[in-house]
């Protein structure tokens, strides 16, 4: 799986401690799974949005655990769910 690398998530979330980076990477894998379970489409056309959604969902979960996603993230999720293959 892992559409984004450990380094990408560390950079996006501005993390510099290995323990936090490891936690964020595991969380990113969980966010990727959630997106797929919600029916999000990851194709050549949607790949950039899919990766950005994983990063944004991960950062949001790190900063605001358990809170509802902001509208921008929700819009990306909806766009991916209704994307054509």
Residue ranges: model-predicted function:
Residues 1-85:
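Divalent metal-cofactor coordination and adjacent catalytic microenvironments
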């Amino acid at each position: 799986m892992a559409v984004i690398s450990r380094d990408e998530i560390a950079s996006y979330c501005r993390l510099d401690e290995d323990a936090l980076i490891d936690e964020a990477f595991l969380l990113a894998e969980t966010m990727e799974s959630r997106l797929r379970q919600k029916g999000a489409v990851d194709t050549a056309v949607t790949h950039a949005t899919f990766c950005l959604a994983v990063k944004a969902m991960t950062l949001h979960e790190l900063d605001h655990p358990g809170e509802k996603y902001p509208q921008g993230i929700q819009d990306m999720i909806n766009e991916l769910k209704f994307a054509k293959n």
